[in-house]
Amino acid sequence: MAGDESLVSRVADNGGRLRLRFVRLGDRVHHTVEWLDPAMAATALIESREGQASDNWPASPPLQQLLIEPRGAAGHVALLVGMAGRSHWSLSIEPLADRVGFRFDAACRIGGPPGWLGHTWRIIPGCPAPALPESQALPGSPAEETGVVGFRPAVDAPGYEARFDSGCLRIVAEDGAECFLESSGMADARIDPMGESPGQTVETIQNGSRSSECRVRATSALAMVATGRFPATVQWRFVIEWVPSST
């Protein structure tokens, strides 16, 4: 890839859209999800967290090559490939036809039982977000200081969402995948996968002192481990979509 490249979603009812912007960081293709308002002004919302070159099972797939090509009525599709250790990853991303967002189709060819296999994102510090009610603020942090946002369970989908001033960004698991949250500011802190623990505590980012990451894990890998048959190809799918604010 040469410089920044991007993929855009269909246009929302309010005239805005999502943009997936790719940029090279070291040997990895990193991506940021942005909201474009009707005037095409961009607000960066979340970004992928990459691993180190020495990681056999990095936080996100170690994608090193990117090709964006036309794909009929869908507009364009992003095709990415990469490798780490003895494993090979591939990822295709295309705009959703009926929603404002993108579908991610991932695969990994593994030679043995995998460690972590999935994706990780964090909310970009400083992005505009509504203040949370005091009941959802972290201990010792008054609600009026909560000019930030965290991930929380989505009400009607197997995933998590982050609410911003102009709408809601959702990460939703589909085939062979599950979503969960992990706090990088507390040892062993974790929120269980969606639907297993009703009434979960909302994780938030507070003044940069604590952050929660949304992760998509390839649960389809568990079946591969149970059979013990390697090498094997693991596949999983998920969606990142935008729901504009109604106000």
Predicted regions, residues:
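Acidic (Asp/Glu-rich), glycine- and aromatic
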Residues: 101-150
